[in-house]
């Protein structure tokens, strides 16, 4: 809880979302960095496994329901802002951020986050603004990736086709 709330000093206070459509951005960083900040204190713990067990089952469980929402939701007026908070934000968004970091590489991601914090210091930012900055540090199309994982509900379906089969037996 302390690590989560401390993360809000940077993601939520130092850089604040432009509108509640992006409220999830401050929560994703708070959840993610809260899970990461304790790693050096407990090197004997399998933090990757704990992260996976804490977030992935809950994210899949929430995201496969008929009433699932995308992580990024549109908000027409402030009176409904409280409806933006929910399991999809607290459970799925850390999984999305972890995927983004793995896609980019930790070093590239950290460079992008530093630029993001510097660019939007004491101001307002959007998710698209962050993706625009992070895009400079990778060859991947992060905008396309974001459309699928952030703006759509549910988990993307992956289909595969086997075109050739071979078998090798080694002794």
Language model features: what each stretch is:
Residues 1-171:
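Hydrophobic alpha-helical and helix-loop surface patches within well-folded domains
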